[in-house]
A protein has these predicted regions:
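Short Pro-Gly-centered beta-turn/loop motif in secreted/extracellular proteins
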Residues: 186-206, 210-212, 220-222, 559-563
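A domain-start/cap signature at the N-terminus of enzymes
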Residues: 229-313, 575, 583-597
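Gly/Ser-rich "nucleophile elbow"/oxyanion-hole loop immediately N-terminal to the catalytic nucleophile
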Residues: 305-311, 358-394, 406-410
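A short, amphipathic beta-strand motif
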Residues: 152-161, 169-171
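Hydrophobic/aromatic-rich core segments of domains that either
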Residues: 1, 10-22, 26-27, 32-123
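C-terminal catalytic histidine-bearing segment of alpha/beta-hydrolase fold enzymes
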Residues: 443, 449-451, 455, 461-542, ...
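Active-site machinery of serine-nucleophile hydrolases
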Residues: 312-379
Length: 611
């Protein structure tokens, strides 16, 4: 039931004796909370179950709680360490075998409704003697395996700061032979559950964990505990190698604060690991020149021009016209688009629209398909994610009008040729270059008149917002829908621009196709029509228009602000954060898992609710 309800063991839970509802709500519980949840689940389907535990193991290492169920007799199962259908098993069997019946500190007690003359020792609330109990220690004394004479149980624990960490532990004797190896237990396991080896008494060993200083030990007693300290960066490296970037979202390790000097090498590691994973997963689709998202397929054609060094090549995504026509017509438009423009440098990509409808390039599947196309070109073709450009003619121009504002955080510039904007607005174009070319006589759907209106609007926006809305608008005299390729002048103008991944000011207007992420902002539940303005002024961040945005995430990194100094965030005039922020692997991993964009990975995050 724990995995099904996304509940995990953690000493970070709010309190020890959480109700089932509190545990389900928080997703975290100690062995006590997990036991209460399991007991409630068993009783709800008619399985008798009761709470069991000890105030203190006889070796003084801590306390523990678990569950007994009735199956012809009382049998136990772990709560923090479930064993499935196997009963009377658990890591604590040996510990329980040392229980001392009749000792209020070291006995094992089971909760009961009967008048028993005993009370259950609640270690988190010792003055409360209201829970009746039975001393069931005798049944556990027989469960432990006998320890051979001359041997001792040696426990191993690896820590990163205050967190237990799962790492490969090797025990090496003086001759250099590995006599024992295994993985230490992390925070998913009970705090008293350790990797254990049976070793001869009075023997000497060296204990090694990669990334930690080796520790020399002498085996002196049973239940001996050996602790090793691991630095954060090697621990993160090991976690990523074992479980990928997702491992840093699931563990406390990913939330430990990073120093400024650790953030960059960790970023390189995360980018490399995620890049290897995506390269393996997507190689076939890239070679097939066809992408798929949500059951929709988008073939594409590409040609390279005067290749720059890997990682510095530009990408030009060129959208064909047509739409609202038979597939054969749109196929011909695709063929035309392949040869319409040439580049001085870069990768020229002409995708085939997934549908033949009038709105070829601005349906909700286009954005994720283009994001995936950009990611793949970065991975396989050495494209610089800061030099990505989109352009389109006719119906392709319609797409540019719509895609450029809502995908601006992934673009350097956009070129609109002979298209119609429909309902879209230019607000989101603030931080990219935008070229608009139109034939003066292209009167169908009032394209020429609307282009003239956009020329005025863009000029006004640029005048009122210094440093924003760079644009080139050319209305070609004497030209109709076909401009005799005069619009090619847009390409060298666009090529002057590089993406600004961390603009000090951004305007995020959600279109009918909504996005969860835009530059250094993100929302949990995007809503069409919301318009957010966000500005960085030194260490202060001011956000306006976010009243309807719900949960808003402000993502930061060094360079945009100084993360070693306090940061203040104002949301619609209300101060919602003031203080220093931690750089964490969790935030970095989440950014890369959302989108493989190595130049747009943030290290810190402030989560704000609606004021």
């Amino acid at each position: 039931i724990f995995a099904a309800n996304k509940v995990a063991y953690s000493t970070k839970r709010k309190k020890a004796d959480q109700s089932p509802y509190e545990t389900l709500e928080s997703g975290l519980a100690s062995c006590t909370g997990l036991s209460i949840l399991l007991i409630s689940a068993c009783r709800s389907v008619g399985v008798p179950a009761r709470f069991v535990g000890t105030p203190l193991w006889s070796d003084g290492s801590g306390n523990h709680s678990w569950v007994e169920i009735w199956d012809g007799e009382w049998k136990f199962t772990g709560a923090a360490e479930p064993t499935g259908e196997a009963l009377n098993q658990g890591w604590f069997v040996d510990r329980a075998a040392g229980a001392r019946s009749g000792d209020p500190r070291h006995a094992i007690f089971a909760a009961t409704w009967r008048e028993s003359g005993l009370h259950f020792p609640l270690v988190w609330l010792p003055e409360n003697r209201s829970v009746r109990a039975l001393d069931v220690s005798e049944r556990y004394l027989k469960k432990s395996a006998t320890i051979p004479e001359g041997l001792a149980r040696v426990r191993f624990r690896v820590r990163v700061g205050e967190l237990r960490f799962s790492a490969a532990v090797r025990v090496i004797d003086p001759s250099g032979t590995v006599t024992f190896e295994g993985f230490s237990k992390d925070e998913r396991f009970d705090g008293n559950d350790h990797l254990t080896a049976l070793l001869p008494l009075r023997s000497r060993y060296e204990v090694r964990v990669e990334g930690a200083d080796p520790v020399s030990i002498a085996v002196e007693r049973d239940e001996q505990l050996v602790e090793l300290e691991l630095a954060l960066l090697p621990a993160l490296h090991g976690a990523v190698e074992q479980g990928g970037l997702e491992a840093l979202l699931r563990s406390e390790l990913g939330r430990l604060p990073l120093g400024k000097g650790d953030a960059q090498p960790l970023l390189q590691l995360l980018v490399e690991q995620q890049g290897k994973r995506l390269t393996a997963e997507r190689k076939a689709e890239h070679e097939a020149r066809q992408l798929e998202w949500g059951g929709v397929r988008m073939p594409f054609w590409s040609q390279s021009f005067s290749a720059a060094p890997p990682g510095r090549r530009s990408l030009w995504i060129s959208m064909h016209g047509g739409g609202g026509a038979p597939a054969a017509v749109n196929d011909q438009q695709w063929e035309n688009q392949k040869r319409l423009y040439t580049l001085e440098e870069g990768v020229y990509v002409a995708p085939r629209a997934p549908t033949d409808t009038w709105n070829l390039w601005h349906q909700d599947h286009i954005d994720p398909l283009f994001s995936r196309l950009i990611e793949n070109m970065v991975l396989f073709e050495g494209v610089d994610p800061d030099r990505v450009y989109i352009l389109g003619y006719s119906a392709g121009g319609d797409g540019v009008y719509q895609l450029a504002p809502r995908m601006a955080d992934q673009l350097a510039a956009a070129g609109m040729m002979a298209g119609h904007p429909n309902e879209t607005q230019p607000d989101g174009l603030r931080n990219i270059g935008f070229a608009l070319h139109m034939g003066a006589d292209d009167s169908a759907y009032n394209r020429n008149q609307i282009a003239a209106q956009w020329k005025e609007r863009l000029a006004k926006l640029a005048a009122e917002d210094k440093g924003g809305y760079a644009h080139q608008v050319v209305i070609h005299a004497g030209k109709g829908h076909w401009m005799d390729r005069e619009e090619r002048a847009a390409l060298p103008w666009m090529a002057r621009f590089k993406r600004v991944p961390d603009p000090e000011k951004l305007i995020w207007l959600q279109d009918d196709v909504v996005h969860r992420r835009y530059y250094w902002l993100a929302v949990d539940e995007p809503k069409a029509g919301t318009r957010i303005t966000a500005v960085v002024e030194g260490q202060n961040i001011r956000i306006e228009g976010a009243k309807e945005a719900g949960v808003l995430r402000v993502r930061l990194r060094d360079g945009l602000v100084d993360l070693d100094r306090p940061v203040a965030v104002y949301r619609d005039g209300l101060k919602v954060h003031s203080g220093k922020l931690s750089r964490t692997a969790e935030v970095m991993s989440r950014c890369l898992l959302e989108r493989y964009d190595p130049q747009a990975v943030y290290t810190a995050e402030i989560v704000t609710g609606a004021p």
